[in-house]
């Protein structure tokens, strides 16, 4: 028999995604084979597409929900046919034995297994430690939203947000919106959000933000101080990142003295930093990325429970869906917020 092939979308190095036949993903000892059902296009996927100048060998895509096709013995009682959200980056590739894994920080594993490709292909392989069973009450759309929700769960757990805190969120794209939901769920007294596009403003309100302002300079800072009696937000989450640095400084300005600025967006350019204000006001700047396990509970588990509670209509942020053959249209729409897009999903 010949090599088994599947369909996958690969960037040709010029920003164009071409669907082609590629070998099935490599299997490692104890890894599971999962059929991808739905995947989200992340902002990082868009940024990497604009920066990549060589053709991809493996498909990307890390916001994944799928069905287990094959799985060996595991301690999570997972069996073929189970519907799962897949933690692609950390737990799904972790050795589980290094100092980081033993402390629940699988994303920092120093012996991670080789990457075998992501959710823009028909099949993926990951270790059972990165598979989280979806309840029957969650559909595939929610399943593919577990990953971005877990990012915000991790950010606000890591920052040790307290009930009654005033939380600011800079940006109302996918991660900003999930940060609003998590902050409200964790008991924030008020959540102040900034948003640039009409669909983001509407979504931020639906997700529970108490105050939503435009992205114009000064409006967010003023709103955070107004909401806190002139003190500033206890925690500000910077969720935008990208090829600019203004939102980093804006987040610091909106944070109260001895408060926390959670740097979640990830800037892709060199930055000139004037940190004298942050130093004088003893603001703690916390860099946060992805997800982990704390007190024996993974951020994915909390994200699944939060989505299953249906307290906030987070599923509504998925504005567009395309099948794999039309993934290029998906990237075009996801890149153009004037199209009305927030989250774009790819279905198999």
Feature-to-residue mapping (PLM):
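Glycine-rich beta-strand-centered segment in the early N-terminal region that forms part
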Residues: 25-39, 52-97, 135-137
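Glycine-rich cofactor phosphate-binding loops and adjacent beta1-alpha1 units
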Residues: 202, 206-284
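C-terminal substrate-binding/catalytic core of Rossmann-like NAD(P)-dependent dehydrogenases/reductases
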Residues: 269-320, 328-329
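NAD(P)H dinucleotide-binding glycine-rich loop of Rossmann-like/cofactor-binding domains
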Residues: 90-170
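Mid-domain Rossmann-like dinucleotide-binding core that forms the NAD(H)/NADP(H) cofactor-binding site
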Residues: 138-217, 222
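Short glycine-/small-residue-rich Rossmann-like dinucleotide-binding loops
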Residues: 40, 72, 89, 240-241, ...
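C-terminal capping/lid region of NAD(P)-dependent oxidoreductase domains
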Residues: 2-5, 214, 226, 230, ...
């Amino acid at each position: 028999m010949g090599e088994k092939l599947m369909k996958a979308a690969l960037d040709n190095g010029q920003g164009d995604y071409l669907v082609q036949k590629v070998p099935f993903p490599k299997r490692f000892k104890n890894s599971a084979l999962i059929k991808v059902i739905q995947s989200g296009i992340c902002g990082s996927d868009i940024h990497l597409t604009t920066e990549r100048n060589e053709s991809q060998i493996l498909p990307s895509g890390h916001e994944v929900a799928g069905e287990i096709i094959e799985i060996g013995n595991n301690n999570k009682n997972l069996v073929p046919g189970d519907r799962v959200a897949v933690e692609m980056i950390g737990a799904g590739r972790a050795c589980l034995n290094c100092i980081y894994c033993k402390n629940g920080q699988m994303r920092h594993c120093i012996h991670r297994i080789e990457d075998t490709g992501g959710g823009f292909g028909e099949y993926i392989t990951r270790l059972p430690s990165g598979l989280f069973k979806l309840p029957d009450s969650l559909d595939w759309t929610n399943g593919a939203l577990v990953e971005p929700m877990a990012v915000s769960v991790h950010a606000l757990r890591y920052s040790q947000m307290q009930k009654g805190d005033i939380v600011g969120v800079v940006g109302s794209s996918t991660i900003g919106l999930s940060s609003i939901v998590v902050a409200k769920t964790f008991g924030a007294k008020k959540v102040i959000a900034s948003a640039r596009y009409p669909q983001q403003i509407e979504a931020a309100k639906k997700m529970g933000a108490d105050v939503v302002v435009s992205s114009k300079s000064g409006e967010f800072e003023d709103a955070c101080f107004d909401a806190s009696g002139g003190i500033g937000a206890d925690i500000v989450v910077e969720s935008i990142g990208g090829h600019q640095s203004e939102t980093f400084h804006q987040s610091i300005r909106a944070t109260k003295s001895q408060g926390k600025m959670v740097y979640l967006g990830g800037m892709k350019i060199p930055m000139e930093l004037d940190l004298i204000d942050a130093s004088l006001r003893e603001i703690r700047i916390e860099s946060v990325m992805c997800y982990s396990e704390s007190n024996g509970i993974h951020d994915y588990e909390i994200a699944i429970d939060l989505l299953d509670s249906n307290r906030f209509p987070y599923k509504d942020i998925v504005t567009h869906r395309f099948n794999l053959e039309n993934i290029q249209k998906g990237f075009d729409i996801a890149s153009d917020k004037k199209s009305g897009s927030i989250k774009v999903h790819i279905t198999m």
